[in-house]
Amino acid sequence: MSFASETKKELTKLEMKECCEKAELSALLRMNGSLSFSNRRLSIDIQTENAAIARRIYTLLKKGYNVTVELLVRKKMRLKKNNVYIVRLVEKSREILADLQIVREDFSFIRNISQELIEKKCCKRSYLRGAFLAGGSVNNPETSSYHLEIFSLYKEHNDSICELMNGFDLNSKTLERRKGYITYLKEAEKITEFLNIIGAHNALLKFEDIRIVRDMRNSVNRLVNCETANLNKTIGAALRQIENIRYIDETVGLDILPDKLREIAQLRVNYQDVTLKELGEMVSGGKISKSGINHRLRKIDEIAEKLRAGETVVKK
């Protein structure tokens, strides 16, 4: 089971107050429902591939409105042959849609979220939970990027969802897709906040556990890469210095170097694996800093380059 499916399964087990049940059901019917007329009767089909969500819708309708509800199961024939669950409401459809603030009294469609429906903070959370159950997805935190989104067919409702989420300081964004619109989150901290808002506390803990391990692993990898790069840089510099010292020795001899430079040159060749700090502790006459040693080695490099260029070097 995917992380998103586990999250939704957890959400379908939550207990709610009556006002919150109405807010969640409104989102589920609005986003997953479709209307049909048969024998002059209006019916509503709410379709989902998640059995737990279908049971949730069935229970909320029975509990909230005491109506006859049918539950149908069909097999998808294309691509993945998953079951499709259809919750069919065949009575009081018009009254229920109006009560859930999906249609007006004249049966015209309400495209945004009714403020009356989400007046309380708990109902705001519940509407977002219903919207996530109906059209939401969230990436497994083990994947390369963090992403949570809620899909809506029309812009007004999508904008309402974005506004509702940002009322909780989630910094959500909207984007038009080929067949609709999405409101999405990309920041891991905001995704965990959203999971907390809708009541997916087990999913939140799992997300955070995986994220912490992943971030620690990335930090260790960055540290190792940095140390490896520094080590390679140090080794490269040491090899260059030794090559230049040997070139000077083979062409004009190390006696051409001033005493302080000659001492460092001999130490560098004799102790090729030691650090600049350790070289500074080996010189006669007192300890020299890393920058002091580095300065002398650069002078040796300059002399080697002058010799390669055919210039005459005189001992100073």
UniProtKB/Swiss-Prot annotation:
Positions of disulphide bridges: none
InterPro entries: Homing_endonucl (IPR027434), Sporu_reg_WhiA_N_dom (IPR018478), Sporulation_regulator_WhiA (IPR003802), Sporulation_regulator_WhiA_C (IPR023054), WhiA_LAGLIDADG_dom (IPR039518)
GO annotation terms (biological process): cell division; regulation of sporulation
GO molecular function term, any single one: DNA binding
Signal peptide span: none
Alphabetical list of SUPFAM superfamilies matching this protein: Homing endonucleases
Keywords, sorted A to Z: Cell cycle, Cell division, DNA-binding
DNA-binding region positions on the chain: 275-309
Domain of life, source organism: Bacteria
Family per record: Belongs to the WhiA family.
Function: Involved in cell division and chromosome segregation.
UniProt name for this protein: Probable cell division protein WhiA
Annotated source species: Bacillus cytotoxicus (strain DSM 22905 / CIP 110041 / 391-98 / NVH 391-98)
